[in-house]
Amino acid sequence: MTTSSFVVYDFDTPLFEDIVKERINRFVVITQSGKLCHLHDPGRLKELIYPGNRILIREHKGRKTNYMVLAAHSGTGWVVTDSSIHNKIARNFLPSDVKSEVKVNNSRLDFYYDNTFVEVKGCSLVVDGKALFPDAPTERGKRHLEELIKLKMQGYRSLILILVMRDDAICFSPNWKTDKKFSMAFKNAVEEGVEVTIKLLKLIDNKIWYIKDIQLCPDAFNYSH
């Protein structure tokens, strides 16, 4: 960590290690110890949630589950998989008077402050040092980018805030292989002046730390990579 690192989220509860037995659907995981866990992430997470992999869970009483998956092991470190906390983390990097869940035309963007619209994206996939988003096709994500472009052209400041939920990424790129339409919209957004800020995070014990900002990969807009 660096001298500029700081805590951006505290789970404030013990985290228990377990092992995935089965992912029975997008949102429910059964562990080897027999626990039924809620997985709050719309992505595929196939590189993280698979039988035999290590996960971190905590007690969380739901309608069908008593636990929640918070992180999974990548082989080199923990990756936070709880997407419900993304906007709470994002607030650490925004003014205190920011407005949340702002309706704009046919979309709802995450934040607004001082003539600035902000959309937050959480990234859990890293391949060969590249943080990649999305890990599953996202029409909603593409629509958000198109809205940010329109707002930029209308004179607003538009910002994409990317939270990389692990600390082993060197740079970020849209995931052309998984979602070419989103990636093209991301490229268009940057070319139209939409700003991109990428935060590298790390889970230590039961706290998430901000480590540093990273940049777009040099080949981020290369369709073939």
Swiss-Prot record:
Question: Which InterPro entries is this protein grouped with?
Answer: SfsA, SfsA_C, SfsA_N
Q: Which Pfam families match?
A: SfsA, SfsA_N
Q: Gene3D superfamilies from the entry?
A: 2.40.50.580, 3.40.1350.60
GO molecular function terms noted in the UniProt entry: DNA binding
- On the tree of life, the source organism's domain of life is Archaea
Q: Which PANTHER family match?
A: SUGAR FERMENTATION STIMULATION PROTEIN A
Report the sequence similarity comment from the record. Belongs to the SfsA family.
Name of the protein described by the UniProt record: Sugar fermentation stimulation protein homolog
Gene name of the encoded protein = sfsA
